[in-house]
Amino acid sequence: MANFKGHALPGSFFLIVGLWWSLKYPLKYFYQKEKSNQLTHHYQRLEIIEAAIRTLFAVIGILVEQFVPDGPHLHLYHEDHWVKLMNWQHSTMYLFFAVSGIMDMLTYLITHVPLGLDRLVMALAAFNEGFLFYYHVRDRPPLDQHIHSLLLYTVFGGALSLAVEVVLRDNIVLELFRTSLLLLQGTWFWQIGFVLFPPFGGPEWDQNSHDNIMFVTMCFCWHYLAALCILAASYSLVYCFLTRVKRPEDREVIGIQKLRSDHTYRKALLSGSDEE
């Protein structure tokens, strides 16, 4: 949809998944670092639930793009012209992400699925998004082209990271890098909506102003800095939470050891006095 809601919807989806990943990957990393098996019991179930939710998000996106009042309603061609190709492009983007979610579920439900195929399909979905957006804004005003082209850095960067993860699976650095780009993508979709379609009746941006292009470029850097801050805060939050949870257990173990040592000392002292 060529309006504010059409950019806020995917932006919200990417933000929700990005915030979840910013908590999930540090949690998985700390448990793997401690070589703890506590998480393995529930981790696969979490992955399946996440994949199902991402698939649901994609299906909702397709339905919204197709069946809004001015949408194509599944009509691609009518009489002598194409019908709402922009909505069809957005639907195609969502379709690939739905396939990615389904592949993620199959990876954890069926043991015969090759490991790494889920990452490969997700990389293809991200590449497809970038490919569509590259040709999405041709022959548009300069500011419109520029603000959408900045989005390509996050999309193709995420696709590249996912492609590397096919080989280097469970690499925390790659996972956090991908998460930061997804957060950036989510906030930037919202920014595009505010710039091109001001929701509160504000003044429209001059689409041909070079100063506006310079500001938008700088604003993109600010968005990424904000994404990194969110990621750092989530990482620290998970670390502090796990440290606090483990502390009572450590105290309990230390207390038991101390009681045992005190009991052994008293027993040795009593046996020594009996001999005297």
Curated annotation (Swiss-Prot):
The chain crosses the membrane at residues 7-27, 48-68, 95-115, 147-167, 181-201, 213-233. It is found in: Endosome membrane; Lysosome membrane; Golgi apparatus, trans-Golgi network membrane. Pfam families: DUF716. Its main location: membrane. The modification Phosphoserine is found at S271, S273. Keywords: Endosome, Golgi apparatus, Immunity, Innate immunity, Lysosome, Membrane, Phosphoprotein, Transmembrane, Transmembrane helix. It is a multi-pass membrane protein. The keyword Transmembrane applies. GO terms for biological process: innate immune response. InterPro entries: DUF716, TMEM45. It comes from the Eukaryota. The keyword Transmembrane helix applies. One of its GO terms (cellular component) is endosome membrane. PANTHER family: EPIDIDYMAL MEMBRANE PROTEIN E9-RELATED (PTHR16007), TRANSMEMBRANE PROTEIN 45B (PTHR16007:SF59). Plays a role in innate immunity. Belongs to the TMEM45 family. This is Transmembrane protein 45B.
